[in-house]
């Protein structure tokens, strides 16, 4: 059990959250453009 507590105490959850938000923002741009292109809308 000590291994699990040491493992989780060493994880920097703030960094993981920031990288996750950055990835979501970076992915959102191309996704919007692809969805508009598939619908035939004006960009």
UniProtKB/Swiss-Prot annotation:
HAMAP family: PSII_Psb30_Ycf12
Membrane topology: Single-pass membrane protein
Taxonomic classification: Bacteria, Bacillati, Cyanobacteriota, Cyanophyceae, Oscillatoriophycideae
Alphabetical GO biological process terms: photosynthesis
Subunit structure: PSII is composed of 1 copy each of membrane proteins PsbA, PsbB, PsbC, PsbD, PsbE, PsbF, PsbH, PsbI, PsbJ, PsbK, PsbL, PsbM, PsbT, PsbX, PsbY, PsbZ, Psb30/Ycf12, peripheral proteins PsbO, CyanoQ (PsbQ), PsbU, PsbV and a large number of cofactors. It forms dimeric complexes.
TM stretches of this protein: 16-36
Family indicated by similarity: Belongs to the Psb30/Ycf12 family.
Name of the featured protein: Photosystem II reaction center protein Psb30
Pfam families recorded: PSII_Ycf12
Domain of life, source organism: Bacteria
Keyword Transmembrane helix: yes
Record localization: Cellular thylakoid membrane
Originating organism: Trichodesmium erythraeum (strain IMS101)
Task of the protein: A core subunit of photosystem II (PSII), probably helps stabilize the reaction center.
UniProt keyword list: Membrane, Photosynthesis, Photosystem II, Thylakoid, Transmembrane, Transmembrane helix
Disulphide bond pairs: none
Gene Ontology cellular component list: photosystem II; plasma membrane-derived thylakoid membrane
């Amino acid at each position: 059990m000590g291994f699990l507590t040491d493992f989780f105490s060493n994880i920097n959850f703030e960094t993981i959250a920031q990288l996750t938000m950055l990835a979501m923002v970076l992915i959102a741009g191309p996704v919007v453009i692809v969805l508009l292109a598939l619908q035939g809308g004006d960009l």
